[in-house]
Amino acid sequence: LNEYKSPFYLYDQEILLQSIRQLYELSDNRVTLLYSVKANPLLYICRLMKQSGCGLEVSSQGEIYLAIKAGVEKSRIYYSGPGKTVFDIQYAIEKGVGIISVESVDELNLINTVALNKNIIQPVFIRINPNYKSKGLRFSMTGVSSQFGIDEEVLNDNFFDEINLLDIESMGKGL
């Protein structure tokens, strides 16, 4: 370690892979583990995550590029986060990103428009910010308006029926 003259990160590949195996075992392989690329956008780590069976959660065009370069199946790339521009969404759809997380009704409509123009049915995951106040917690993302998800009170009874009319495919709803 003395030969390095600057700070660096040291990863133990075996411990990392063992941790991933344990997570899969604990879930009886019923989950899809996603590695958040923004946590450490290194090509080698992304390739390691792919080899271990993880999908990648990305939040920018650069991270989409990195995931594809790492050889991750496009269906296992999940694009999430607020602030996606029309160019970000176009890029994600053009590159064949597996699922795009929807953070607002406007974003849902934008994804639909881009997908329609490209004659693609785009899978989406709709993130809902529930109108629920937790008791006893100091910090909570529920019960307050947030850039992360669609506020529950914005949704009407026909919201999910209307989604079926769009050129998108709802892969699920998350709180």
Feature-to-residue mapping (PLM):
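Active-site loop/helix belt of alpha/beta enzymes
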Residues: 130-175
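Glycine-rich, aromatic-flanked loop segments that form ligand/cofactor-binding clefts
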Residues: 121-133
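A charged N-terminal "starter" segment
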Residues: 1-100, 105-122, 167
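Residues in well-ordered beta-strands of folded domains
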Residues: 80, 127, 149
